[in-house]
Design a protein with these regions (language model features):
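Recognizes extended acidic, P/S/T-rich segments that occur
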Residues: 58-105, 118, 140-143
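Single conserved hydrophobic/aromatic residue that forms the stacking wall/gate
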Residues: 378-385
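Pro/Thr/Ser/Gly-rich low-complexity, intrinsically disordered linker/stalk tracts
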Residues: 20-48
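Boundary at the C-terminal end of the N-terminal hydrophobic targeting segment
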Residues: 16-18
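Activation corresponds to long, low-complexity, non-globular regions
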Residues: 288-373
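Short amphipathic, basic-aromatic surface patches that mediate peripheral association
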Residues: 49-53
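Sec-dependent N-terminal signal peptides
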Residues: 4-12
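Accessory beta-strand-rich segments of carbohydrate-active enzymes
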Residues: 47, 84-93, 105-109, 114-116, ...
Length: 385
């Protein structure tokens, strides 16, 4: 009798074990791997399938979501457990769980069944982090600027009857903002910064540029909405004093009427908004926001145009302005801007440096301009070296 029971137990274990002839990989949320800044209450999941058998077809799937990897591994998918869903869908499967929280990291995994009702092993665990799901989640963060917006004037460009309503187009100064704050002497669980800088911004923390993005944020109808970008800065913060820095360019938010241009429009002076949320291991929370406590100064960027390029005057640099020991007593207080667009998380792939070309030689021509020659090899499909 004892042998019969053991045999039955082994047979049962074999029947419920995963079939290793097919598996799930390449998990994405909203078509991105482990994204930060999801601002939808129903993000969509996708995955790819590996199968040894040809013409494999998914018969069913199960997606599980939790707010910690331990809970997920212990089958405590309290955020969402889809159960076994009879479907061959594996692209953009919508989340249908509990209401998601802002600035929260979620963990998810998936497994599938084939047409013989055999189940795969669970996939590896992937993550997604929510952004700020409502304007109210920005807390006390305010839009701040260096200068006031000029009054609205119609007819700056084109004929009066065809003109776009616009701010008066002027040479607004290009600002750099600074905020010093203290991180508590406790272990950080996670920290996210949400930044919108119009027209474009560079974000710095303790002297280093955060992320490898350029020309954030994306263009939009600025009188209706503004994009923000989410950054995971957990590993960049240090205990004690820290310094945030933001530099702004005009982008399409303010197009100056100098040099080459096509669309001539302005929504006002360059401005920015920031919300930083630090969660410590003891679950306590610290918030840093853009408000009147920030300082501002003119940046070394003396001209900025989406059409006409950028002029950077290195003689105007202020060494150390992004560090805690900098003396900012000569900087101005910021202005709080009267601006309240809908805040939308930027989900497009960012602009990034894809290739760098070394300078081979440089010289000063007869006009006093410096000319740089770079090395670049360009091959077409039928050419060889």
């Amino acid at each position: 009798m004892y042998r019969i029971v053991i045999f039955f137990m082994l047979l049962t274990a074999v029947n419920v074990s995963a079939d290793d002839s097919f598996s799930v990989y390449c998990l994405t949320t909203e078509q991105a791997e482990n994204p930060v800044g999801i601002d939808s209450q129903s993000p969509r999941f996708s995955w790819k399938i590996y199968a040894q058998k040809r013409n494999f077809k998914q018969y069913a799937y199960q997606v599980c979501v939790a707010d910690s990897p331990d809970k997920l591994m212990n089958s405590e998918a309290h955020v969402w457990d889809s159960g076994k869903v009879i479907s061959d869908k594996s692209i953009l499967v919508p989340f249908k769980g509990v209401k998601l929280k802002s600035s929260q990291v979620y963990y998810w995994r998936v497994r599938i069944w084939n047409d013989e009702d055999k189940v795969s092993a669970w996939s590896q665990i992937n993550t997604f982090a929510t952004g700020l799901l409502a304007n109210s989640d920005w807390g006390n963060a305010q839009w701040i600027s260096m200068e006031k917006d000029e009054g609205r004037v119609k007819g700056i460009h084109y004929q009066e009857e065809e003109a776009l309503p616009t701010q008066k187009v002027g040479m607004y100064k290009l600002p750099q903002f600074r905020k010093q704050f203290r991180v508590k002497d406790k272990k950080i669980s996670r920290a996210f910064a949400y930044v919108s800088g119009l027209g474009h911004f560079d974000f710095f923390l303790n002297g280093g540029k955060v992320g490898n993005h350029f020309l954030d944020a994306g263009w939009t109808l600025y009188d209706k909405e503004a994009f923000y970008v989410s950054f995971d800065i957990t590993d960049l913060l240090q205990r004690g004093e820290n310094v945030l820095g933001i530099m702004l360019g005009n982008g399409f938010y303010n197009v100056p009427q100098e040099r080459y241009f096509k669309l001539l429009i302005s929504y006002g002076a360059p401005k920015m908004k920031l919300y930083l949320r630090i969660v410590y291991d003891d679950a306590s929370v610290q918030e840093i926001v853009s408000d009147k406590s920030w300082k501002v100064s003119e940046s070394p960027v003396v001209f900025s145009s989406i059409y006409g390029g950028e002029d950077y005057d290195a003689t105007r640099e202020q060494p150390g302005w992004m560090y805690a020991d900098f003396d900012s007593s000569g900087w101005k207080n910021v202005l709080v801007a009267d601006y309240a667009p809908k805040m939308v998380s930027q989900q497009t792939e960012p602009l990034q440096i894809r290739e760098e070309m070394p300078v081979v030689t440089y010289f000063k021509n007869e006009k006093g301009n410096w000319v740089y020659a770079v090395s670049y090899t360009h091959l077409r499909a039928h050419e060889t070296l």
